[in-house]
Amino acid sequence: MARIIDLVPWDECSAHLYASPAILIPLERVRRPLAGVKHQLYHPGLPSLRRMDMDSVKGCLSDEHCQSSTYYTKDDFNEAHFTLLGVPNKPLHCLDFTATGQKLCHKYRDGKMIPIVPGIQRADWPCFTRAIEDWSQFVSKSGEFKLPCANRRVEGFSGYAVRYLKPELTQNWRYCLNQNPSLDRYGQKPLPFNTLNSFRRFGSHYSRINYLTPWH
């Protein structure tokens, strides 16, 4: 936004000036190449994935695409800052190239780095990298699944309509967990009366007891 004040003199010899009311004229925002103003990693106004996708669909050029241009100036990028939760566990690999980086590297090795946030020590931080090890130990300690015996004629699974198929029919799976009846060349398979019941219990109160209903 810009404010324009028009100064109009009363006459040529008079020193009094007349100020007209301020007029606000919206100025068009100027886009700048991102490579010309950004010289650090942090971006204070990072565009969203939706915004980048919209510019890609519109076919914007590089000077209009939000991925390669920005409304921020070089001063905005230089003054932008952020704070970390604490001191990182591992130092950056690029600290040995500059003199400041070498000093920080020596402080890291000597343990003289002070936490950015007071009261947060390195020993108090939760370690999220042990999740995979904890999960593997949990899985190894848990019980193994017992596979069904192939020699038995009928396998009993409580709560599901399970049927036994001969190997010459399917050539692959012997046990089918289809809960709904299927129609094929062998005819319709028998369906238990409580298959569609949500609780899948024999004689449940939420399903009609069909075996007690007379058929005549």
Swiss-Prot record:
InterPro entries: SPMIP8. Microtubule inner protein component of sperm flagellar doublet microtubules. GO terms for cellular component: axonemal A tubule inner sheath; sperm flagellum. PANTHER family: TESTIS, PROSTATE AND PLACENTA-EXPRESSED PROTEIN (PTHR35348:SF1). The gene is Spmip8. This is Sperm microtubule inner protein 8. Microtubule inner protein (MIP) part of the dynein-decorated doublet microtubules (DMTs) in flagellum axoneme. May serve to reinforce and thus stabilize the microtubule structure in the sperm flagella. It is found in: Cytoplasm, Cytoskeleton, Flagellum axoneme. Signal peptide: none annotated. Its main location: cytoplasm. Pfam families: SPMIP8 (PF22574). GO terms for biological process: flagellated sperm motility; sexual reproduction. Keywords: Cell projection, Cilium, Cytoplasm, Cytoskeleton, Flagellum.
